[in-house]
Every structure is written in structure tokens, then in C-alpha cells.
Amino acid sequence: MKNIHKIFSPEKKGKEKISVVTCYDFSFARILGETPIDSILVGDSLGMVFQGNSSTLPVTLEEMIYHTKVVRRGAPDKFIIADLPFLSYQTSIEEGIRSAGRMMKETDCDAVKIEGGSDFICELVAILKQIGIPVMGHLGLTPQSVHVFGGHRVQGKGEESSAKLLREAVALSESGAFSIVLEMIPAELGKRVSEEVGVLTIGIGAGPDCDGQVLVLNDLLGLDANFQPKFLKKFSNLHSIVKDAIESYHEEVRSGEFPGKDHSF
């Protein structure tokens, strides 16, 4: 278990950016374990990226526990944050405590992430902190509320909505969240929130002035050739690399070139 106060220290504001990557499986987690990346998020975005659903809503707590266990095996020394999925904490404080407790006990993760900034969510964050469960907040485009937003749209564009987001960010910080993800909001709002809250902000489509950034590993590696939101920079083109490798394998099997003597007993 990594030291939360070392990795997510507010003293890093303006000094050292935090790098976070979202991962769902053992093989990629093992690679991440060999890198200097600061933290791994096991996101309920696995519902879309890994399962092929149109949203994160179908993901269950059991599925999140399974994937978080797998990622922990691959990256035993990384600071791992696990999403609590839709309806695993919104129905009551008691349900939120049970879900967060299960996640921590059964996966050996270091923290949980929950979406929203309502009074209910802030109360849950405060209680979880009191019982020893670190919580990362999530504001802006919160995918579990995608139907309320009318799709995956930039949030906080108007004066009223930006003021509301800022109030919620301050409330989350004061309730005990150790960090807040800001997703798909104007860069200027991302800067303002980062300046006004006392904890580190982690942006995804929230501009360069957040205290850190998070991207889904599959996305930054370019595994999906058709996925290109404005906030995404692809640092590789694994779609073409994987496709070329599979086509080469297919051709060598057909021709009889593989397996050769080097691959035979």
C-alpha cells in the first residue's frame, strides 16, 4: 500500500503534476507497475471500454471488485483507486459504507472514487474518511449521470453551472476528499477550481492547469481507431500494430511458415 500523503500531497500544487492511468487487467497493470506512473484508477469505464456497453451504468460492484483484484495482482506497489459503480452508494449512507468497505477489504485497493458533489455525497465522503476509507471525488461530466446530462457533453459552461461545480468542489474538499477528478469542463473553470480547492485536482478534458491528468490506458495507446474525443492525445497507435501482428500470424499459419524449427520441440 502506497502512502497517500506522499502521492497526493497538496504541497505538490504548482510544483509536481500527478499522472494517473485507468487500467482494467493484469497484463497492462504489470506494465504500469514497471513505470513511474503515480497512480492507477480502476474505472467503471470498463463497462464501455472492456465490456462494450454504451455507458458505465450496467457495471456491478462485483465486477469492479474482480477487476480491481486483477489490477492489484499486476501492480502490487502502485497506489490504486477503485470506482464505486452506479447504485452501489447512491441509495443510502449505509449502502455506501458497505460498498466502499467491501472494495477496500476484498481488493487491497488504496482508495475509492465516487461521483457527484451533493450534500448526500459530501456526508458520505466525510463518514468514509472517519472510518478510514480515502475517497477521491469526481465532478463535471460524471458518467453515472449521463442520462441527466443528455449525453457526454461539456459541463460547467454557463455561469450558474460553473458556480455550482465550484461550490461542490469546495464542499468535497472540506468533507475530506483527498483529490477530485474534473471531467470535460472548460479549461478556465478547471484552473479556477484547482486554485480554490485545497486538494489536488486530476483533469480529463479539464485543461492544463489541473494538478494532474488521467487517461484510460487503452485510449492513450490508440487501441480504438474510432475513438477520438477532443481531450484525448494518442501516444501510440496500437490498433494498427495489433492488427498488423495478427495479420502476419494468420499469413504464416496459412503458408506453413509458423511454427518453424525454432518453435517446435
From Swiss-Prot:
3-methyl-2-oxobutanoate binds at residues 44-45, 83, 113. The keyword Magnesium applies. Keywords: Cytoplasm, Magnesium, Metal-binding, Pantothenate biosynthesis, Transferase. Its cofactor is Mg(2+). Its EC number is 2.1.2.11. Binds 1 Mg(2+) ion per subunit. Pathway: Cofactor biosynthesis; (R)-pantothenate biosynthesis; (R)-pantoate from 3-methyl-2-oxobutanoate: step 1/2. Homodecamer; pentamer of dimers. PANTHER family: 3-METHYL-2-OXOBUTANOATE HYDROXYMETHYLTRANSFERASE. Catalyzes the reversible reaction in which hydroxymethyl group from 5,10-methylenetetrahydrofolate is transferred onto alpha-ketoisovalerate to form ketopantoate. This is 3-methyl-2-oxobutanoate hydroxymethyltransferase. It comes from Leptospira borgpetersenii serovar Hardjo-bovis (strain JB197).
